[in-house]
Design a protein with these regions (language model features):
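Mobile cap/lid helix-loop segments that gate and shape the active-site cleft of serine hydrolases
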Residues: 296-335, 340, 347-360, 369-372
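Alpha/beta-hydrolase fold nucleophile elbow
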Residues: 268-280
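Proline/glycine-enriched tight loop/beta-turn segments at coil->beta junctions
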Residues: 159, 174-177, 184-193, 199
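Glycine-rich nucleophile elbow surrounding the catalytic serine of serine-hydrolase chemistry
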Residues: 278-290
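Cap/lid segment of the alpha/beta-hydrolase catalytic domain
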Residues: 188-268, 304-315
């Protein structure tokens, strides 16, 4: 009788404890995270829903010596990730395929650097990247289908030293892209700067965008900006939701190519001086356009280029171009511009914070394959955050003054007229 009673009592004890081998030591995820928070004395903020989620082998995933390893072990099965805010505070977020940690960027740059040691091996890598980026983007299937009609223009509006004219250009499958041309009032050939905009307030209609393009035009450059896919007048055509699709990635690249096709035909454009400049998502587009189009002679991505962030919007990373040639990143894609002039603007408050120590030395190495280290530069603003503020704009002005010979005496943002959004639209 004793032999029967003892196993029965043991079974009751095991069942009461809830964790056992047969159940894979499973616990509710929320309970596990609460215990971890207390154990390591950290605050956890949840950007995910843990309701009903259960974690197998829960307590065995805890590493008493490392909060980082513990959180990674616990969250990975659910495609969640910890994002460190400080030593005592973590945000729990969904897995973000385009965003990694700064340490991951270092590892990726080191791996990429091991693939080429001279110009010849780099050129082979570059050819593979260019071919596979185009394939993954699917751009070559669409370009032959683009309309060849001339754009429709609004009347020219003249201001202090420059003019603005809006346009609407047909692209593919009945779609259009609308934007504005900021041009000097002086006659003759001028450099051209294509200016894809990012996700800053009001897009291309915002004050900062108008200040930059108007100032560059006053100094002697023809500048063009255009709506993001699903923003501005594009939203009237395809809806705002279209911006949050992979299609936006393709169409914004196609729009940039078609606008350049048309702009270099203008009599006032010097085709030997063709630049591209944008910030944030516009900086991501800047790099992509240089990969897709060899006609650019100068590039200036601002607060965008990184080895550990590909761009958080589908318009930047909706198509898997970072999988090209076995894996790449925006820093390597930017390096493909060598040996032509490039200036990268970075700051201490976003994913470009590592640029001086990681991405810029990498760019210098690639430019060194062409003995052109002097053609690549970095303006780093360690105390600034993610924006297109005056110091960043001044860096842009200086780059194009030096590279394209713009007239520095005309550098005065106060002379630019800020127009209302309706004035910048191509459609009535």
């Amino acid at each position: 009788m004793r032999k029967l009673i003892l196993p029965a009592l043991l079974l009751v004890g095991i069942t009461a404890g809830a964790q056992r081998y047969e159940d894979k030591f499973t616990r509710p995820l929320g309970d596990v995270l609460n215990d971890v928070s207390k154990r390591f004395n950290v605050k956890l903020k949840y950007n995910v829903d843990t309701t009903g989620l259960k974690l197998a082998y829960a307590d065995f995933r805890i590493r008493p010596y490392s909060i980082e390893e513990t959180l990674n072990n616990i969250l990975a099965p659910f495609d969640f990730k910890p994002v460190k805010q400080n030593d005592r505070y973590y945000k729990i977020k969904p897995y973000e395929y385009p965003r990694r940690q700064a340490d991951d960027g270092v590892k990726l740059i080191n791996w990429l650097s091991s693939l080429y040691n001279d110009r010849s091996s780099w050129e082979a890598r570059k050819d593979s990247l260019r071919r596979e980026v185009r394939q993954l983007l699917g751009i070559d299937q669409l370009l032959p289908l683009c309309a060849q009609e001339a754009p429709r223009y609004t009347k020219i509006r003249k201001f202090d030293g420059y003019s603005v004219q809006n346009f609407c250009l047909k692209t593919v499958n009945g779609h259009t892209v609308c934007g504005s041309i900021y041009a000097p009032l002086s006659k003759g050939k001028h450099p051209l700067i294509i200016c894809p905009n990012g996700h800053f307030t009001n897009g291309r209609y915002g004050t900062v965008q108008q200040q930059r393009l108007g100032t560059l035009a006053r100094m002697g450059a023809v500048c063009v900006d255009y709506d993001l896919w699903g923003w501005g007048e594009s939203a009237d055509e395809v809806g705002k939701e279209a911006h949050q699709t992979a299609e936006a990635h393709v169409m914004q690249a196609l729009n940039g190519i078609r606008i350049l096709d048309w702009m270099i035909q203008r009599k006032d454009v010097d085709t030997q001086r063709v630049g591209v400049n944008g910030g944030s998502g516009g900086g991501t587009q800047t790099v992509l356009l240089t990969v897709l189009d060899d006609r650019y002679t100068a590039a200036n991505p601002v607060v965008s280029m990184s080895s550990w962030f590909d761009g958080g919007c589908p318009c930047e990373s909706g198509m898997p171009i970072q999988l090209a040639a076995g894996g790449t990143c925006n820093a390597e894609l930017a390096a493909m511009f060598a040996p032509r002039p490039m200036m990268v603007v970075s700051d201490g408050g976003d994913w470009t914070s590592t640029t001086p120590e990681v991405e810029f030395p990498y760019l210098q190495r690639i430019y060194g394959f062409y003995n052109a280290q002097d053609k690549v530069s970095n303006i780093h603003l360690p105390k600034e955050r993610h924006d297109f503020g005056p110091n960043k704009r001044n860096a842009v002005y200086r780059f194009f003054i030096d590279t394209f010979g713009l007239d520095e005496s005309k550098l005065d943002e106060s002379k630019v007229t800020i127009e209302p959004e309706e004035a910048l639209k191509a459609r009535p």
